[in-house]
Amino acid sequence: MGFNTNLKEQVITFFSALSLSKDFFNFIWIAFSILILLLTITIGVLVLVWLERKISAGIQQRIGPEYAGPLGIIQALADGFKLLLKEDIIPSKGDNWLFNIGPAIVVIPVFLSYLVIPFGHNIILADLNIGVFFWIAISSIVPLGLLMAGYGSNNKYSFLGGLRAAAQSISYEIPLALCVLSISLQLSNSLSTVDIVEAQAKYGFWGWNVWRQPIGFLAFFIASLAECERLPFDLPEAEEELVAGYQTEYSGIKFGLFYVASYLNLLASSLFVTILYLGGWHFSIPFLLNSNYLEWVFSHGSNQVINIIIGIIIVLIKSYLFSFIAIMTRWTLPRVRMDQLLDLGWKFLLPIALGNLLLTASFQAFLL
C-alpha cells in the first residue's frame, strides 16, 4: 500500500540511517499497511451496520439505535462485545472440525478481496493484473465455508441453507464475470482495478462505465446483491423456511463472524461497483467541479496528502451511496422463491451478460 512514494523513500532513508536492513523496513511497511487496512475495514463495517439500522428504522417509522453513543453510533460495537461474552455451543452429534472451521472459511476470503481494492492511485496493497478476477475467484470460496458449516451442524435446516448458498453462488458468479470481461474488453484491456479506474478518468464524468455499459451495470448490480445473499436473495438463511439457515446451530463469536462476513461482502461489492462503474477515486462531476472551493483544492494538487484524502472520501461516498440502494432494496422488496432465484440467474442474467459481451466485442471489432 503506497500512500506516498516519496514518503516511503524518506522512511527507507531514515531506517538506513539507523543501520536497519531494507528487508526489515519492507516487513514493517507491509505489516503497517495491513493494520491500517484492517482498521479502515472495521470502521467501514461499523458505519455500514449503523446506517442499515437507521435506514430500516426510518422506513418502518421507528427511531432505531439511540442510546449507545451519539445517535446510537456504537450500537454495533456493543452487539459485537455481547456476542464475545456468549457461550460457544457445539452440536453434540455434529462434525466439530467442519463446524469450527466453517465461519473462518467464510470470513477470510472476504477480507482477502480488499487487497485489490484501490482507494487512490497508490493506495492499494496488491495491484494485480487480474485484480477483479481475483475478487471473483476468492469470493467463490465463501459458499464452501457455508456448506461446511451447514453439514457440520448435523441439522437439516443448516444443510439446506448451505446447499442453497452453493447453488446461488454458482448461478450468479458467471454473469458477474461476464460483466467484468465486457469492461476489460471495451476500455482498459486489463483486469487491474487501477487500470480500469484510470481508463474511465480519460473521458471524465461521461466516461464512467455506468454510461458506457448500462446493461452490464444492471446485471452486475443484481448479481452482486445475490452474491451478498441479501433480500430479496437471502434464500440460504430464510427465517420463515429454514429458521436461520446455515447459522441455526451457531452462537457467540462464530455467529458474529457470519454477521461480519455479510457486511464485509456488502461493503466490498459496493467498493467494486465504485471502481468498475463509477470512476473510482476521480471526481468528475462537471457542475460541482466549477465551484471555487474545489478549484482551489485541485489547484493545490502538489500536496499529495490532500489528494489522497480527497480520493478516499470520494470512493467512500460513492460506495455508501450504492450501499444505501442495497439497504433500501432489502427493506422494500419481498423475498423471491428458490426457483425464481435460479431462473433469474440462468434464464435472465446469463443471456443478458452474454449478449452484452457479444455487443461489446462487435463494437470493438467495428472500430478496428
Curated annotation (Swiss-Prot):
It comes from the Eukaryota. GO terms for biological process: aerobic respiration; photosynthesis, light reaction. Disulfide bonds: none annotated. It is an enzyme of class 7 (translocase). Its main location: plastid. Pfam families: NADHdh (PF00146). The chain crosses the membrane at residues 27-47, 97-117, 130-150, 269-289, 308-328, 348-368. It catalyses: a plastoquinone + NADH + (n+1) H(+)(in) = a plastoquinol + NAD(+) + n H(+)(out); a plastoquinone + NADPH + (n+1) H(+)(in) = a plastoquinol + NADP(+) + n H(+)(out). NDH shuttles electrons from NAD(P)H:plastoquinone, via FMN and iron-sulfur (Fe-S) centers, to quinones in the photosynthetic chain and possibly in a chloroplast respiratory chain. The immediate electron acceptor for the enzyme in this species is believed to be plastoquinone. Couples the redox reaction to proton translocation, and thus conserves the redox energy in a proton gradient. The keyword Cell cycle does not apply. NDH is composed of at least 16 different subunits, 5 of which are encoded in the nucleus. Its EC number is 7.1.1.-. Signal peptide: none annotated. It is found in: Plastid, Chloroplast thylakoid membrane. Belongs to the complex I subunit 1 family. HAMAP family: NDH1_NuoH. This is NAD(P)H-quinone oxidoreductase subunit 1, chloroplastic. GO terms for cellular component: chloroplast thylakoid membrane.
